[in-house]
Amino acid sequence: MNPSSKKSILTDKRRFSLEQLRGKISPDSFHCQIEEYNEYLFNEALKSQNDQMAFTWLLCERSSGAIAAYMSLIADAIKLTATEKELHNLSYTFKTVPAMKIAKLAVSASFQEKYRGLGTLMVEMATEIAVACNEQYFACRFITVDADIEHNESVINFYLKNGFVPNEEIKNKRRKTISMRRDILFKAKL
């Protein structure tokens, strides 16, 4: 399908709902381009959630109930260099800064063919969850992600377009992923 003929989902978010994973997912209900991400959803996500290791959220099409995308969220803390702290106006002496990590994010291949912006919608929903945590439960300054360049080299551009920047403290220490962060306080002020 021609990318320009795809509908942008960001213009009509009401078409989808975000639901927490409640039971085992059937392998015929979701398929993305990366098999490891399919296997995680089918075989590990529910156990991870039951063990309080990661909460998985499903983006479901309201009309059909089909899973368009999913993300798994976990607690995180990141180290920042002195320059990075200055950039974010952080003068605290804490060794780490509280964050929420998008541990997995995958979009269904069939929905990716029809719509633009599902990944961005998931990042925005993760941001809303982090902001809600800040307002009611615990401090969370950043959303982090380990951009999976092993499976998709262009994923860095996706995260850069969505307001993430590489973490200098972790730069070049990993080869399969690039650690990135997004300042939700800055985003909330926009």
Where are these regions (language model features)?
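Non-catalytic substrate-recognition and accessory regions of acyl/acetyltransferase enzymes
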Residues: 1-114, 120-190
